[in-house]
Regions:
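Active-site-adjacent segment of SDR/Rossmann-fold oxidoreductases
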Residues: 115, 136-146
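Residue(s) in the substrate-gating loop at a strand-loop-helix junction
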Residues: 110
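Active-site helix of classical SDR
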Residues: 90, 126
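Rossmann-fold cofactor-recognition segment
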Residues: 14-33
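Substrate-binding pocket helix/loop in short-chain dehydrogenase/reductase
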Residues: 40, 65-67, 74-76
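Conserved NAD(P)H cofactor-binding loop of Rossmann-fold oxidoreductase domains
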Residues: 27, 57-63
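C-terminal helical subdomain
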Residues: 143-146, 150, 158, 167-203
Length: 203
């Protein structure tokens, strides 16, 4: 979730399961400074000592319009959240990922990240680029214990989907919970053999 209240609900759910105590470390991805990333890494290092994985799931849609008329400020915002933030976060967190026995970095992709479509603008460009980022991290990897993959959630019942397809009946779409097994697969040890791949959550 983007709000502290939503994060606190997840925090409480994790604690209720008897899992290790989590931490809430908010970071505004659209405007984070190098110092913000440094503080995040330092805090994670002090509290946990290592990082077993990253799921880069934050994203914004931008505008559904032609590139010829695409607002540059919206373009910059989409690129900051969808492309720059996951790249910088991964780069900064590499030392903590390297301390894990098996670390998994998962980037959120999209159908328009495989093939561009008209009027998807910055969102499509950012997702095509994030697929390349994942592949390059995988190919250039100097830490054999870290793997990098992409996942395309497909048509899912989310606010972003409703914004992109306002005339679509959301009840016809699977919920995020329904596709969660695919995410858990990529984050867990069952996918140790996968690196530099891109999968569809609904296949």
């Amino acid at each position: 979730g983007r709000t502290l209240n939503k994060l606190e609900v997840i925090y409480d759910e994790i604690e209720s399961l008897g899992a290790p105590q989590p931490a809430i470390l908010p970071l505004q991805l659209s405007s984070a400074s190098p110092r913000d990333y440094e503080l995040l890494v330092d805090t994670l290092d002090k509290q946990f000592g290592r990082l077993d994985g990253i799921l880069h799931n934050a994203g914004i849609l931008g505008e559904r319009t032609e590139l010829a008329n695409y607002p540059t400020d919206v373009w910059d915002d989409v690129m900051a959240v969808n492309l720059r933030a996951p790249f910088v976060l991964t780069q900064e967190l590499l030392p903590l990922l390297a301390k894990s026995q098996h670390a998994s970095v998962v980037f959120a992709s999209s159908g328009v990240g495989r093939e561009s479509r008209e009027r998807w603008g910055a969102y499509s460009v950012s997702k095509i680029a994030i697929e390349a980022v994942s592949q390059l991290f995988a190919k250039e990897n100097v830490h054999p214990n870290i793997r990098y993959n992409c996942i395309n959630p497909g048509a899912t019942r989310t606010a972003m989907r409703a914004k992109a397809y306002p005339n679509e009946d959301p009840k016809t779409l699977p919920t995020p919970d329904a596709i969660m097994p695919a995410y858990l697969y990529l984050m867990g040890d069952d996918s140790l053999h996968m690196n530099g791949q891109s999968i569809d959550a609904q296949d």
